[in-house]
């Protein structure tokens, strides 16, 4: 049985680790160090570490990338599998295993290379995305492709639901591809670099909704940045969780109804269906209207 060194950190990598633990000999899990989380800033282990400990798999959390080289030399894996590890690997590590270093990327490469392919695909209004299994090289997400699988982006999908779908389907694709790779039945296909697009990390300022954009664009931003896209109302921050486009025109950012929470955009309007109130309570738009009683045409982006 082939010896796999698994490298992954967040929840997205958990289904892949589960599948590999069932189908191969996972000799170790490499994850990012524990980080402070929550209001108490308690040191919290990454999800892959929690699963590895449960499965009795050795866990490694190097602080620096250069620590990976002696680790891989010592463990001697047949293949390194990378799923959202969180750092670019040193060149010296990539070719150490006889079956190279393989990565699962949540887009149909060469589209959406980079750290935020799921968010960016939804924010761009894409109707389809998928997973790519590829060889890792020195450039970001530019290695030869071993397998791809398409997945539709449903209208109801947001970052959370689409991430779960891609993580589960990607885990199976990765395991099946690795089996064929070990048997010599997969031929790497170079990417068309001229068609490459990029998915840079989401910046802090992008979470704030700009009502001057079209309603479709704002809705897709809310879906892609779920659950953290926000606006302000009477000086308080409100997170918008779910919205639908309404064929109604008005001044961008102003409330257009007294019973339903409808906000005008640069083109058409959005009905806010679910939100998190300033008090941190998840609620429907209609309940917000009853509780906060906003005035007709009151700005929904006021400081």
Swiss-Prot record:
Residues binding (6S)-5,6,7,8-tetrahydrofolate are 107-110
Superkingdom classification of source: Bacteria
Q: What is its EC number?
A: 2.1.2.9
Checking Gene3D superfamilies in the record gives: 3.40.50.12230
Catalytic activity from the UniProt record: L-methionyl-tRNA(fMet) + (6R)-10-formyltetrahydrofolate = N-formyl-L-methionyl-tRNA(fMet) + (6S)-5,6,7,8-tetrahydrofolate + H(+)
Q: Cystine bridges: which residues? A: none
- Record keywords: Ribonucleoprotein included? no
Q: Per the record, GO CC terms?
A: cytosol
Q: What does this protein do?
A: Attaches a formyl group to the free amino group of methionyl-tRNA(fMet). The formyl group appears to play a dual role in the initiator identity of N-formylmethionyl-tRNA by promoting its recognition by IF2 and preventing the misappropriation of this tRNA by the elongation apparatus.
Family from the record: Belongs to the Fmt family.
Q: What is this protein called?
A: Methionyl-tRNA formyltransferase
Q: What is the organism of origin for this protein?
A: Aquifex aeolicus (strain VF5)
- Highest lineage ranks of the organism? Bacteria, Pseudomonadati, Aquificota, Aquificia, Aquificales
């Amino acid at each position: 049985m082939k010896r796999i060194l698994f490298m992954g950190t967040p929840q997205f990598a958990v289904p892949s680790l589960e599948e590999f633990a069932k189908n191969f000999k996972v000799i170790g899990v490499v994850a990012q160090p524990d980080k402070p989380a929550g209001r108490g800033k308690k040191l919290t282990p990454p999800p892959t570490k929690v699963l590895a400990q449960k499965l009795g798999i050795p866990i490694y959390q190097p602080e620096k990338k250069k620590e990976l080289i002696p680790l891989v030399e010592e463990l001697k894996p047949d293949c390194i599998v990378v799923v959202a590890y969180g750092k670019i690997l040193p060149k010296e590590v990539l070719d150490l295993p006889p079956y190279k270093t393989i990565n699962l990327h949540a887009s149909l490469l060469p589209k959406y290379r980079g750290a935020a392919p799921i968010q960016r695909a939804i924010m761009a209004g894409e109707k389809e995305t998928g997973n790519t299994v590829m060889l890792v090289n020195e450039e970001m997400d530019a290695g030869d492709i071993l397998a791809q699988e398409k997945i539709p982006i449903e209208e109801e999908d947001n970052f959370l639901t689409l991430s779960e779908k891609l993580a589960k389907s990607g885990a199976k694709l990765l395991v099946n591809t690795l089996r064929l790779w070990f048997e010599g039945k997969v031929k790497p296909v170079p990417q068309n670099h001229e068609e490459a697009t990029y998915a840079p990390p989401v910046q802090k300022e992008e979470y704030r909704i700009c009502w001057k954009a079209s309603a479709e664009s704002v809705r897709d931003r809310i879906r892609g940045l779920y659950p953290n896209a926000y606006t302000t109302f009477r000086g308080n921050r409100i997170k918008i969780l779910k919205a639908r486009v309404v064929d109604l025109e008005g001044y961008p950012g102003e409330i257009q109804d007294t019973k339903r929470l409808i906000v005008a955009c640069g083109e058409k309007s959005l009905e806010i269906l679910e939100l998190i109130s300033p008090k941190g309570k998840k609620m429907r738009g209609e309940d917000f209207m009853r509780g906060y009683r906003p005035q007709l045409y009151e700005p929904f982006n006021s400081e």
